[in-house]
Amino acid sequence: MNGSEPKIEIFKPFGEAFELTKKILFQPFDLKKWLVIGFAAWLANLGGGGGFNYSYNRREEMQKVNETLSQIPHSLLVTAICVLVCFVLVVIVLFAWLRARGCFMFIDCIAKNRGAIAEPWRGFRNEGNSYFLFSLLVGIVLLVFAAVFSLPLVLPIIKDSTFLRTHHVYVIVAIAALIFAMIFLLLAWSLIASFMLAVMYRQRCRASEAFTIVTRLIATHPGEMLLYCLFWIVLALATALVACLATCATCCIAAIPYVGTVILLPLFVLLCSFSLLFIRQFGPDYDVWASFVPPEFLPILLSLSSVPATSAPSSNPPPEPPPRPSI
Protein backbone atom coordinates (compact mmCIF):
# COMPACT_ATOMS: atom_id res chain seq x y z
CA MET A 1 0.00 0.00 0.00
CA ASN A 2 1.19 3.52 -0.76
CA GLY A 3 2.36 5.34 2.34
CA SER A 4 0.15 8.34 1.50
CA GLU A 5 -3.02 6.23 1.39
CA PRO A 6 -5.01 5.78 4.61
CA LYS A 7 -5.18 2.36 6.21
CA ILE A 8 -8.84 1.36 6.22
CA GLU A 9 -9.97 -1.08 8.91
CA ILE A 10 -13.33 -2.55 9.91
CA PHE A 11 -13.03 -3.95 13.42
CA LYS A 12 -10.97 -1.12 14.90
CA PRO A 13 -13.64 1.55 14.25
CA PHE A 14 -16.23 -0.80 15.72
CA GLY A 15 -14.20 -1.20 18.91
CA GLU A 16 -13.76 2.56 19.11
CA ALA A 17 -17.49 3.04 18.50
CA PHE A 18 -18.15 0.76 21.47
CA GLU A 19 -15.87 2.89 23.66
CA LEU A 20 -17.49 6.06 22.31
CA THR A 21 -20.95 4.72 23.18
CA LYS A 22 -19.85 4.10 26.76
CA LYS A 23 -18.46 7.63 27.01
CA ILE A 24 -21.61 9.23 25.62
CA LEU A 25 -24.24 7.29 27.55
CA PHE A 26 -22.64 5.82 30.66
CA GLN A 27 -19.61 7.90 31.68
CA PRO A 28 -21.34 9.54 33.44
CA PHE A 29 -24.95 8.39 33.15
CA ASP A 30 -27.30 11.35 32.66
CA LEU A 31 -30.99 10.50 32.28
CA LYS A 32 -31.89 13.88 30.75
CA LYS A 33 -29.09 13.59 28.20
CA TRP A 34 -30.16 9.98 27.46
CA LEU A 35 -33.77 11.08 26.80
CA VAL A 36 -32.72 13.99 24.58
CA ILE A 37 -30.35 11.88 22.49
CA GLY A 38 -33.07 9.22 22.36
CA PHE A 39 -35.47 11.76 20.88
CA ALA A 40 -32.91 12.73 18.23
CA ALA A 41 -32.33 9.04 17.44
CA TRP A 42 -36.08 8.46 17.22
CA LEU A 43 -36.44 11.33 14.73
CA ALA A 44 -33.46 10.02 12.74
CA ASN A 45 -35.19 6.64 12.42
CA LEU A 46 -38.75 7.93 12.07
CA GLY A 47 -40.81 5.65 9.87
CA GLY A 48 -38.21 2.88 9.99
CA GLY A 49 -39.80 0.92 12.81
CA GLY A 50 -42.34 -1.81 12.73
CA GLY A 51 -45.01 -3.44 14.81
CA PHE A 52 -46.83 -6.65 15.39
CA ASN A 53 -49.81 -7.94 13.44
CA TYR A 54 -52.34 -10.16 15.15
CA SER A 55 -54.25 -12.08 12.46
CA TYR A 56 -57.15 -13.78 14.18
CA ASN A 57 -60.55 -14.02 12.40
CA ARG A 58 -59.07 -12.03 9.53
CA ARG A 59 -61.52 -13.51 7.01
CA GLU A 60 -64.56 -12.55 9.08
CA GLU A 61 -63.20 -9.04 9.56
CA MET A 62 -62.66 -8.59 5.83
CA GLN A 63 -66.18 -9.82 5.15
CA LYS A 64 -67.62 -7.24 7.54
CA VAL A 65 -65.52 -4.51 5.93
CA ASN A 66 -66.75 -5.48 2.46
CA GLU A 67 -70.37 -5.43 3.64
CA THR A 68 -69.88 -1.98 5.14
CA LEU A 69 -68.20 -0.60 2.03
CA SER A 70 -70.95 -1.96 -0.22
CA GLN A 71 -73.48 0.23 1.60
CA ILE A 72 -71.52 3.45 0.93
CA PRO A 73 -72.36 5.38 -2.27
CA HIS A 74 -69.74 4.88 -4.98
CA SER A 75 -68.94 8.59 -5.44
CA LEU A 76 -68.51 9.11 -1.70
CA LEU A 77 -66.30 6.03 -1.45
CA VAL A 78 -64.02 7.22 -4.28
CA THR A 79 -63.73 10.67 -2.68
CA ALA A 80 -62.91 9.16 0.71
CA ILE A 81 -60.22 6.93 -0.82
CA CYS A 82 -58.63 9.89 -2.63
CA VAL A 83 -58.62 11.95 0.58
CA LEU A 84 -57.11 9.04 2.50
CA VAL A 85 -54.38 8.53 -0.10
CA CYS A 86 -53.50 12.24 -0.05
CA PHE A 87 -53.41 12.22 3.75
CA VAL A 88 -51.10 9.20 3.80
CA LEU A 89 -48.78 10.84 1.26
CA VAL A 90 -48.64 14.03 3.33
CA VAL A 91 -47.80 12.02 6.47
CA ILE A 92 -45.07 10.10 4.62
CA VAL A 93 -43.51 13.33 3.33
CA LEU A 94 -43.73 14.92 6.78
CA PHE A 95 -42.04 11.91 8.38
CA ALA A 96 -39.32 11.98 5.72
CA TRP A 97 -38.65 15.67 6.43
CA LEU A 98 -38.51 15.14 10.19
CA ARG A 99 -36.25 12.15 9.69
CA ALA A 100 -33.85 14.15 7.51
CA ARG A 101 -33.64 16.91 10.11
CA GLY A 102 -33.31 14.39 12.92
CA CYS A 103 -30.33 12.67 11.29
CA PHE A 104 -28.18 15.78 11.67
CA MET A 105 -29.40 16.31 15.23
CA PHE A 106 -28.40 12.75 16.12
CA ILE A 107 -24.97 13.07 14.50
CA ASP A 108 -24.42 16.36 16.32
CA CYS A 109 -25.28 14.73 19.66
CA ILE A 110 -22.70 12.01 19.02
CA ALA A 111 -20.00 14.27 17.56
CA LYS A 112 -20.19 16.80 20.40
CA ASN A 113 -21.20 14.40 23.20
CA ARG A 114 -24.23 16.38 24.23
CA GLY A 115 -27.98 16.22 24.35
CA ALA A 116 -29.18 19.10 22.19
CA ILE A 117 -32.25 19.58 20.01
CA ALA A 118 -32.85 23.26 19.24
CA GLU A 119 -29.29 24.27 18.28
CA PRO A 120 -28.60 21.49 15.72
CA TRP A 121 -32.19 21.81 14.45
CA ARG A 122 -31.51 25.43 13.53
CA GLY A 123 -27.82 25.05 12.68
CA PHE A 124 -28.29 22.28 10.12
CA ARG A 125 -31.57 23.49 8.63
CA ASN A 126 -30.20 23.95 5.11
CA GLU A 127 -28.39 20.60 5.12
CA GLY A 128 -31.45 18.81 6.51
CA ASN A 129 -33.80 20.30 3.93
CA SER A 130 -31.36 19.53 1.11
CA TYR A 131 -31.01 15.93 2.27
CA PHE A 132 -34.81 15.62 2.55
CA LEU A 133 -35.41 16.81 -1.01
CA PHE A 134 -32.67 14.56 -2.37
CA SER A 135 -34.03 11.55 -0.44
CA LEU A 136 -37.51 12.30 -1.75
CA LEU A 137 -36.16 12.34 -5.30
CA VAL A 138 -34.36 9.03 -4.72
CA GLY A 139 -37.58 7.51 -3.34
CA ILE A 140 -39.52 8.60 -6.43
CA VAL A 141 -36.82 7.17 -8.71
CA LEU A 142 -36.94 3.84 -6.86
CA LEU A 143 -40.74 3.71 -7.13
CA VAL A 144 -40.59 4.43 -10.87
CA PHE A 145 -37.91 1.78 -11.29
CA ALA A 146 -40.03 -0.78 -9.40
CA ALA A 147 -43.08 0.08 -11.51
CA VAL A 148 -41.19 -0.20 -14.81
CA PHE A 149 -39.38 -3.36 -13.73
CA SER A 150 -42.69 -5.01 -12.76
CA LEU A 151 -44.35 -4.36 -16.13
CA PRO A 152 -43.11 -7.65 -17.70
CA LEU A 153 -44.91 -9.43 -14.86
CA VAL A 154 -48.06 -7.33 -14.55
CA LEU A 155 -48.96 -6.87 -18.24
CA PRO A 156 -49.23 -10.59 -19.09
CA ILE A 157 -51.42 -11.13 -16.02
CA ILE A 158 -53.74 -8.30 -17.09
CA LYS A 159 -54.01 -9.62 -20.64
CA ASP A 160 -54.51 -13.27 -19.68
CA SER A 161 -56.28 -14.29 -16.47
CA THR A 162 -54.83 -17.81 -16.72
CA PHE A 163 -51.24 -16.59 -16.97
CA LEU A 164 -50.47 -17.23 -13.30
CA ARG A 165 -51.57 -20.86 -13.54
CA THR A 166 -49.73 -21.62 -16.77
CA HIS A 167 -46.42 -19.80 -16.21
CA HIS A 168 -45.39 -20.61 -12.64
CA VAL A 169 -41.65 -20.55 -13.32
CA TYR A 170 -41.76 -17.21 -15.13
CA VAL A 171 -43.78 -15.59 -12.35
CA ILE A 172 -41.48 -16.90 -9.61
CA VAL A 173 -38.32 -15.81 -11.44
CA ALA A 174 -39.76 -12.36 -12.21
CA ILE A 175 -40.82 -11.77 -8.60
CA ALA A 176 -37.47 -13.01 -7.28
CA ALA A 177 -35.57 -10.76 -9.71
CA LEU A 178 -37.68 -7.74 -8.72
CA ILE A 179 -37.16 -8.39 -5.00
CA PHE A 180 -33.42 -8.92 -5.46
CA ALA A 181 -33.05 -5.72 -7.51
CA MET A 182 -34.99 -3.64 -4.97
CA ILE A 183 -33.03 -5.04 -2.02
CA PHE A 184 -29.76 -4.29 -3.81
CA LEU A 185 -30.82 -0.72 -4.61
CA LEU A 186 -32.07 -0.11 -1.07
CA LEU A 187 -28.81 -1.41 0.42
CA ALA A 188 -26.79 0.75 -1.97
CA TRP A 189 -28.83 3.83 -1.08
CA SER A 190 -28.54 3.08 2.66
CA LEU A 191 -24.75 2.87 2.32
CA ILE A 192 -24.53 6.08 0.31
CA ALA A 193 -26.97 7.94 2.55
CA SER A 194 -25.12 7.09 5.77
CA PHE A 195 -21.88 8.50 4.33
CA MET A 196 -23.66 11.48 2.75
CA LEU A 197 -24.82 12.59 6.20
CA ALA A 198 -21.27 12.55 7.55
CA VAL A 199 -19.95 14.47 4.53
CA MET A 200 -22.73 17.06 4.72
CA TYR A 201 -22.20 17.49 8.46
CA ARG A 202 -18.45 17.96 7.99
CA GLN A 203 -18.37 20.06 4.82
CA ARG A 204 -21.75 21.84 5.16
CA CYS A 205 -22.47 21.10 1.50
CA ARG A 206 -25.63 20.29 -0.42
CA ALA A 207 -26.92 16.75 -0.83
CA SER A 208 -26.08 16.57 -4.54
CA GLU A 209 -22.46 17.49 -3.81
CA ALA A 210 -22.26 14.96 -1.00
CA PHE A 211 -23.72 12.29 -3.28
CA THR A 212 -21.01 12.95 -5.86
CA ILE A 213 -18.27 12.86 -3.21
CA VAL A 214 -19.51 9.62 -1.65
CA THR A 215 -20.05 7.76 -4.93
CA ARG A 216 -16.55 8.77 -6.01
CA LEU A 217 -15.18 7.52 -2.68
CA ILE A 218 -17.00 4.19 -3.06
CA ALA A 219 -15.70 3.79 -6.62
CA THR A 220 -12.15 4.46 -5.40
CA HIS A 221 -12.33 1.98 -2.48
CA PRO A 222 -14.78 -0.76 -3.57
CA GLY A 223 -13.18 -3.53 -1.51
CA GLU A 224 -13.23 -1.63 1.77
CA MET A 225 -16.79 -0.47 1.14
CA LEU A 226 -17.95 -4.02 0.40
CA LEU A 227 -16.45 -5.29 3.66
CA TYR A 228 -18.06 -2.42 5.54
CA CYS A 229 -21.43 -3.14 3.95
CA LEU A 230 -21.26 -6.85 4.82
CA PHE A 231 -20.23 -6.11 8.40
CA TRP A 232 -22.97 -3.49 8.70
CA ILE A 233 -25.57 -6.04 7.53
CA VAL A 234 -24.39 -8.42 10.27
CA LEU A 235 -24.71 -5.61 12.81
CA ALA A 236 -28.18 -4.73 11.54
CA LEU A 237 -29.34 -8.34 11.85
CA ALA A 238 -27.89 -8.55 15.37
CA THR A 239 -29.63 -5.29 16.26
CA ALA A 240 -32.95 -6.60 14.94
CA LEU A 241 -32.52 -9.76 17.03
CA VAL A 242 -31.75 -7.74 20.17
CA ALA A 243 -34.75 -5.49 19.46
CA CYS A 244 -37.04 -8.53 19.19
CA LEU A 245 -35.70 -9.96 22.44
CA ALA A 246 -36.11 -6.59 24.17
CA THR A 247 -39.67 -6.32 22.88
CA CYS A 248 -40.53 -9.75 24.27
CA ALA A 249 -38.70 -9.11 27.57
CA THR A 250 -40.53 -5.81 28.12
CA CYS A 251 -43.96 -7.18 27.14
CA CYS A 252 -43.98 -5.15 23.91
CA ILE A 253 -43.15 -1.88 25.69
CA ALA A 254 -40.06 -1.59 23.47
CA ALA A 255 -42.39 -1.59 20.44
CA ILE A 256 -43.87 1.76 21.51
CA PRO A 257 -42.47 4.64 19.40
CA TYR A 258 -39.75 6.67 21.14
CA VAL A 259 -39.90 4.43 24.23
CA GLY A 260 -38.29 1.59 22.30
CA THR A 261 -35.65 3.94 20.92
CA VAL A 262 -34.78 5.12 24.43
CA ILE A 263 -34.50 1.52 25.66
CA LEU A 264 -32.32 0.49 22.72
CA LEU A 265 -30.40 3.78 22.51
CA PRO A 266 -26.94 2.19 22.98
CA LEU A 267 -27.50 0.18 19.79
CA PHE A 268 -28.45 3.28 17.78
CA VAL A 269 -25.46 5.24 19.11
CA LEU A 270 -23.14 2.30 18.42
CA LEU A 271 -24.24 1.92 14.79
CA CYS A 272 -24.08 5.64 14.03
CA SER A 273 -20.69 6.00 15.75
CA PHE A 274 -19.35 3.06 13.76
CA SER A 275 -20.33 4.69 10.46
CA LEU A 276 -18.79 8.02 11.48
CA LEU A 277 -15.57 6.39 12.68
CA PHE A 278 -15.26 4.22 9.58
CA ILE A 279 -15.57 7.05 7.05
CA ARG A 280 -13.29 9.18 9.24
CA GLN A 281 -10.40 6.95 8.19
CA PHE A 282 -10.49 8.38 4.65
CA GLY A 283 -9.21 11.79 5.74
CA PRO A 284 -10.17 15.05 7.45
CA ASP A 285 -12.72 15.91 4.74
CA TYR A 286 -14.83 13.01 6.04
CA ASP A 287 -14.12 13.53 9.75
CA VAL A 288 -17.00 15.01 11.78
CA TRP A 289 -14.49 15.65 14.60
CA ALA A 290 -12.05 17.58 12.41
CA SER A 291 -13.03 21.00 13.79
CA PHE A 292 -13.92 20.04 17.35
CA VAL A 293 -13.13 17.07 19.58
CA PRO A 294 -14.69 16.77 23.05
CA PRO A 295 -11.82 16.40 25.55
CA GLU A 296 -13.24 13.12 26.85
CA PHE A 297 -13.06 11.69 23.31
CA LEU A 298 -9.35 12.41 22.83
CA PRO A 299 -8.06 9.05 24.20
CA ILE A 300 -10.35 7.24 21.75
CA LEU A 301 -10.09 9.42 18.66
CA LEU A 302 -6.34 9.97 18.87
CA SER A 303 -5.83 6.26 18.26
CA LEU A 304 -6.83 6.83 14.62
CA SER A 305 -4.10 8.09 12.34
CA SER A 306 -6.56 10.17 10.31
CA VAL A 307 -7.11 12.70 13.08
CA PRO A 308 -5.80 16.03 11.79
CA ALA A 309 -3.45 18.13 13.82
CA THR A 310 -6.01 20.94 14.13
CA SER A 311 -8.43 18.85 16.17
CA ALA A 312 -5.87 17.66 18.70
CA PRO A 313 -2.76 19.83 18.86
CA SER A 314 0.33 18.09 20.05
CA SER A 315 1.45 18.87 23.60
CA ASN A 316 5.06 17.96 22.74
CA PRO A 317 6.23 20.06 19.78
CA PRO A 318 9.50 19.09 18.09
CA PRO A 319 12.58 20.71 19.62
CA GLU A 320 13.87 23.88 18.01
CA PRO A 321 17.25 23.72 16.22
CA PRO A 322 20.19 24.98 18.28
CA PRO A 323 21.11 28.64 17.71
CA ARG A 324 23.93 29.38 15.32
CA PRO A 325 27.14 30.58 16.93
CA SER A 326 27.75 34.29 16.49
CA ILE A 327 30.67 35.28 14.26
State where each predicted segment sits.
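Juxtamembrane transition segments at transmembrane-helix termini in multipass membrane proteins
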Residues: 2-19, 23-36, 40-48, 52-56, ...
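Alpha-helical transmembrane segments of multi-pass membrane proteins
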Residues: 19, 23-26, 122-142, 216-235
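Helix-boundary and loop/linker segments of multi-pass membrane transporters
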Residues: 26-27, 70-78, 121-126, 164-171, ...
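Mid-bilayer segments of alpha-helical transmembrane spans in multi-pass integral membrane proteins
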Residues: 46, 92-101, 105, 140-144
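Juxtamembrane helix-boundary/capping and inter-helix hinge elements in multi-pass membrane proteins
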Residues: 111-117, 126-127, 203-207, 220-221, ...
